[in-house]
């Protein structure tokens, strides 16, 4: 099984959502569990990203929020889990 890492940014997003939308945090953890089993398929409509985010993947949390992550042979890095990846 790949090592799971969560970036400081994603940890901050989870903390923010715990206060504003706690039900989303449960969905985020469900997505993360599924990513560990099926990094490139599964729930949340996995999508390989392009352009500035090439090499990363996203899954839908809601219409507004996306979970963005990287996958290697050794690890899964959760990059962000709030807002849409086009929001810079």
Where are these regions (language model features)?
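Enriched for short, Lys/Arg-rich terminal
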Residues: 3, 11-30, 43, 50, ...
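Residue-level signal for threonine
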Residues: 7
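Generic detector of intrinsically disordered, low-complexity, polar/charged segments
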Residues: 38-41, 52
């Amino acid at each position: 099984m790949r090592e799971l890492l969560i970036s400081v940014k994603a940890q901050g997003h989870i903390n923010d959502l715990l206060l504003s939308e706690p039900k989303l945090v449960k969905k985020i953890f469900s997505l993360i569990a599924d990513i560990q089993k099926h990094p490139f398929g599964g729930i949340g409509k996995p999508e390989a990203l392009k352009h500035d985010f090439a090499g990363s993947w996203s899954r839908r949390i809601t219409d507004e929020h996306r979970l963005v992550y990287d996958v290697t042979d050794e690890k899964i890095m959760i990059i962000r889990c709030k807002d849409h990846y086009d929001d810079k």
